[in-house]
Amino acid sequence: MGKKLKQKIKEKEDTQKLLAEVTQKDIFHCHDGQVLRSMKDLSNALSMMADETYACHWNTQKKDLSNWVRNIIGDIKLAMELEGATSRSLAAWEVATRMAYLDRQIP
């Protein structure tokens, strides 16, 4: 197997890991009761959650969602975008944009 093919396979596997569900011990419990198991769950939750709920998980001291994305899902790029997402709608857009990009990487 060629070096390029091996790299392409690894990139696909890495992308699939970012989009996969996390283990039971790593799920994220939102203030409003929603349970997040994947980036897709995060996207759906952000589209439905109240701005007040988002504020419980994101402020100048707390960045719960970006920490979960970085440390559990493993997506450093998205985590950095979420750190700067001062509103729920911006966070929802960042997650949807990242998911669309990752989906295109899987043939």
Predicted regions, residues:
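Terminal, compositionally biased segments used for targeting/anchoring and flexible tails
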Residues: G2-P107
